Amino acid sequence: MVHLRRTTSPYWWPIPRKAGGVWAVRPSPGPHSLAYSIPLALVIRDVLRYAKTLREARMIISRGYIKVDGVVRRNYKFPVGLMDVVEIVPTGEIYRVVPDERSYYALVPITSEEADLKLLRVEGKTAVKGGRLQVHFHDGRNLIMPAETARQIKTFDSVLYDLKARTVRSHIPMRLGVYAVVTHGGNVGFHGQLSEIVWTLKRRQSVVLLKRGEEAKRTILDYIMAVGAEAPVIKISP
């Protein structure tokens, strides 16, 4: 695997660039890309500050004390990204990774009732055998659904997924009036009602306008996620 220098790591990682050594932990291949993920070791050491050194963070992780989306992760390089649920098993603390205007991504504490819930954005669909469709989500997850159900779910829509039951609880279409949050780009973390979509030949580059009170922000369709019909269905901000 190619090494990763601190100076070339994603700018929002909470690590010093010119101190602490030359190299940073490079996320292993997984559900999120390098640009939009942070290694589990840095979550434990630099974000939550449960460890002072990488050695301590690796020890905590290797002992099975950390769950991501309800699964024990022992790989300290595991990539943690948007909407992932991080649980500290010994303390019972649970956090969700959400877009944040100050730190790009932030971990916000959530209740145990929300721990099994995760918002997933639809990235595409593929036809499979048996007349069914496979729906692809932003975190690398794939679900095979009956064609009638999957046809109602469009690219850019969101679903509220039950991690424990492994089922879709609800469907949130990407349409005017929906409540959405900016997940990437210069306006990351801003959330509000989707009031305008200017469609372009490249759908992902379509310009959208989000409004919250008197404040409004423009970005592209590829940079937003629907999080509720009129209000967020889960906690999305600190």
Swiss-Prot record:
Family matches, as Pfam families: Ribosomal_S4e, RS4NT, S4
Domain S4 RNA-binding: 38-109
PROSITE patterns: S4 (PS50889)
GO BP terms, alphabetized: translation
UniProt entry tagged with the keyword Ribosomal protein: yes
Keyword terms, alphabetized: Ribonucleoprotein, Ribosomal protein, RNA-binding, rRNA-binding
GO cellular component: cytosolic small ribosomal subunit
PANTHER family, sorted: 30S/40S RIBOSOMAL PROTEIN S4, SMALL RIBOSOMAL SUBUNIT PROTEIN ES4
Database matches in HAMAP family: Ribosomal_eS4
NCBIfam families: PRK04313.1
Family designation: Belongs to the eukaryotic ribosomal protein eS4 family.
Name used for this protein in its record: Small ribosomal subunit protein eS4
Organism encoding this protein: Pyrobaculum neutrophilum (strain DSM 2338 / JCM 9278 / NBRC 100436 / V24Sta)
